[in-house]
Amino acid sequence: MSKLIYLDNAATTQVYPEVLQEMLPYFSEVYSNPSAIYSFASESKKAVDKARTSVAELINAKTDEIYFTGGGSESDNWALKATADAYASKGKHIITSTIEHHAILHTCAYLEKKGFEITYVNVDENGKVKLDELEAAIRPDTILISIMTANNEIGTIQPIKEIGRIAHEHGVLFHTDAVQAFGHIPIDVEEMNIDMLSASGHKINGPKGIGVMYIRKGVKILSFIHGGAQERKRRAGTLNVPGIVGIGKAAEIAKNIMAERSAKEISLRDHMIDRILTEIPYVRLNGDRHDRLPNNVNVCFRYIEGESMLILLDQAGVCASSGSACTSGSLDPSHVLLAIGLPHEIAHGSLRLTLSEKNTVEEIDFVVDELKKIIERLRSMSPLYEDFVKKQNK
């Protein structure tokens, strides 16, 4: 198979042709600034309003609760830093989990330097937040709980509705980083008790450089970027109209095809998992087997170094990763895999394969066949594996 097989959709996705076509006029034809008052600007404003409605409908929010940002990381920073600023008089305690994206963890580290106290609740072996530990961590000065909807590395989906309920029962705001889940699994901000939500365009076949922040009416969040009066005076800066149009169209498509796309991806995902676990020895599936994103496969191979595996897969025309693209190049094992209890030597042998509905069974079979050869080749060069096999055969 000579064509490229892309299995890194958790890192970014291909822009749908329909999304691109929707965006194109707003680069050179309808190029007006939507904040202007002349009639030419009304076309851009209508496009922004339409996109805001599409995003709101995807998560059952009101249109005036949707704010456009420069990406998921900005939205995460906004949620944590602005909440800290606005509610510091009530308290300086924030709760999050040990497996959050670094956009959350590094922001928490920043806030710690500013005098805030962060509690990092643990997860179980499948990556699910321990609800009893979460509730026990709440204090009178707790102002925010931030837990991701689904993990970007191992795909585990959190019990968001229950977490939101716990937060609200204690009078605490609840933010969720939904960057990996938005458009892929059903999200209802009302039913799930969500006060703030972060999302990104390029994870749902939309453009890069555009994100979403949902803020429930009544939540006192301050401006994060200061300047003009855009986004109801909460996020200054000329609106990225093509990007906004793109994420709006991508959200509209995601809402319409979610069930069909999920079914296709789950079928491919489970086929891949079954073959890997059956045909390759000494392998571990990471993440919850059932409560996981439809397109996520994350496994660890014993006596394998992840980077070597990725290089050989790349030579075979397969794009994959060993964890988050935001931490690629790091020699440290994944903080997510360490948090679910894996030792360093096993965490180093991780592989993340994230599919799309465009992939085929033939592609999945090709990748597994190549993977079998690669694992056998790498283990044949490992003295540790040789010693392990000898001990097993005694």
Predicted regions and their residues:
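Pyridoxal 5′-phosphate
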Residues: M1-K394
